[in-house]
Amino acid sequence: MYPRGVKRSHHDYHRQTAFRTIKRSTHRQTSKFISHFAKNFRGKLAPLKQLDESRLDALSLTELEQLKTIIEEKQQEKRAQNNAITFLPNLPTVPFADTNFSLKSLGLRPYNGDARDPKQRIRDRFPQTHERICLLTNDILETDLLLRYRQCLDSLTREENQQLMGDRIFSLTNSPCLAFTVATVEEACSYFKFHDLHNLPVNPQDLFMYTITVMKFEFFNKLNMAKLTCVFNDNGHGDIEYRKLRQLCGKPVLDREMPNSELEVQQQTPDSFRHPIQQAMSIVVTFARILRQIKEQIIQTKKPQFIRDFDTGRVAERYECGLMSRLIGKQFSNHKCDDVSCQNRIERIMAPWKPSLFFCTYFAKDAPKFKLFPNFPEEYRNLSFTCPKVDTEPSCSYSTNHDLPQTSHRSHKNHGTPKVKSKVCVEKPDTSILTTTKTTTEILIEESMETDNKIPNPRELNFNQAKQEEIVIININENVNSKHESESSVEMDLDLDYEADTCETNLNACSSDSE
């Protein structure tokens, strides 16, 4: 052993006491790692920078504008070069950017339908109102629509692609219902089918390809909200079939020993499973496994890879557009049981946009900041999630004794029964007149902010309590008089019917399928 910082000399082997001291320095860079530019031009960087600044000061405005256009062109060239580099490591060029294919070589025809241009759709992220997004199978597989989507996705920069994938993953993880998740999975599977049908090279960093694994887990999470042990119990052994689904998705099964391992279940073909939900999940798992193998092969070979070389079971070839929706709908529509909670769960996960917000505290001027205007279906577009701007006090079903007409007391005396009010008139706010003065809503906000800072007066509290006691509740009767029906088209019937089973709040209390 030698002292710290001392090493035996290799030049004088005959001398036992020949040592040399090693200078330990971790801050100084080794000479072999210094580039040629740093060796020769390290001391000349400052003069070059000053020289460039002096040249820029001598340029005129016209020359500066020309220089600006040249810089923008160079930036576009740099972006194109950076776009040619894949996100996968150790790949100098993109092996899947094959630009040699054309419509004639692929056997496609130009799309002339009502769907918008793919560039606009990718830019807007979501469809506009009354926009056509439901396409036929021939329009998806036999036209150049998906090919244009592929070309648009390949032309995105790395930052734009990451932003687009982040938005898609966020929408998947926050899906409102199973119907939206199934539609998203169907979209990715159709895109996968298009690449297999026309033998296109796969881009692993594609928007639809990259998020297949996320779709698999979110698809299972939405299905798991149903009582799958009851759904799979149509042919018996519901618990075992549910555990097979967990193995298929890669979820742990620890409470029971299964005959097959997780890897063996995932390598089975969709036809080997009994239930349609298992077959749909097997298709997604197979596509995710094929894409993972393609990624590994691209890193090793640095060559374009195709789905046909990895799809040994020909799952993509036998897949049809709309198959996922048919399998899920077939499973839930054919399920019949006496369990009320099971039926309620199926109805809730399949029916989107069920209203769950009954009043809102947002004011109309604050609504655009939060973007509270999503694209709802037509039957739910009449729902308002913001408070309208009303300058006058609207009519309501509650009124004080002073506001009631005097004839109402006579009617009680003559007929002996209270007057029935069957409808409520909804006054529409007049938004045609725009003034710079403060609205009633803004004045009320300022007054409420002023009163919050004051100490409450006991006399005012007693007066408000006495004023609230004067409120009279008008009874609402279901019988509607034909005379009042033709008074106004703006009137709205009050429907007080409700279902008894909607009072159920704890859905996962008695289920064994929740994680």
Curated annotation (Swiss-Prot):
Q: Name one Pfam family in it.
A: Herpes_UL69
> What GO molecular function annotations does the UniProt record carry, in alphabetical order?
zinc ion binding
Which residues fall in a compositionally biased region of kind Polar residues?
398-408
- For bias type Basic residues, the affected ranges are 409-422
- Its GO CC terms? host cell cytoplasm; host cell nucleus; viral tegument
Q: Which GO terms describe its biological process?
A: regulation of DNA-templated transcription
Where is this protein primarily located? virion
Q: Which UniProt keywords apply?
A: Host cytoplasm, Host nucleus, Metal-binding, Transcription, Transcription regulation, Virion, Virion tegument, Zinc, Zinc-finger
Q: Show the InterPro entries listed in the entry.
A: ICP27-like
Residue ranges of region Disordered? 398-422
Please state the residue ranges covered by CHC2-type zinc fingers.
230-342
Family assignment from sequence similarity: Belongs to the HHV-1 ICP27 protein family.
Role according to the record: Immediate early (EI) protein that plays many roles during productive infection including regulation of viral gene expression and nuclear export of intronless viral RNAs.
Q: Per its record, how is this protein called by name?
A: mRNA export factor ICP27 homolog
Q: Which organism is this protein's natural source?
A: Human herpesvirus 6A (strain Uganda-1102) (HHV-6 variant A)
